[in-house]
């Protein structure tokens, strides 16, 4: 399986990564088209297991999970401290929340157990990480041992479209490690 993810550079180095996209059974000579949009969405869940709808987010924007007469709600709350980040503030009087960041409607990153008056901060470089792993599901939080084996970072800065080419694999003495590179790059 081919796993594609991003790293939240606003978090500590040990922050868990989420398998944003998992490509299965892609045979030799096959391709698997996908888009990597610029936009993000955010969502949150409270300590009661209630989940908010995903809201469109722009870098620099802050959101807050706050009580309302209809229950806990996630709403835009102006701008955060940095134009490179999306922030989710826990404005509930009690109870921790989880904040999630999505790209193309798929889970991209998560920050758990955010206490009242604390916030989750999401910041991503314009790059993806890609590698090969088994038994990973899309949206799964990956442990650091798996992430450390996926060390190919591909910068998407200024790229409109490209092909990611995978080489390597096979069995026996002639097998080679998997590698990934960009080809047929079209710049913006």
Which ranges hold each PLM region?
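Intrinsically disordered, low-complexity segments enriched in small/polar residues
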Residues: 1-188
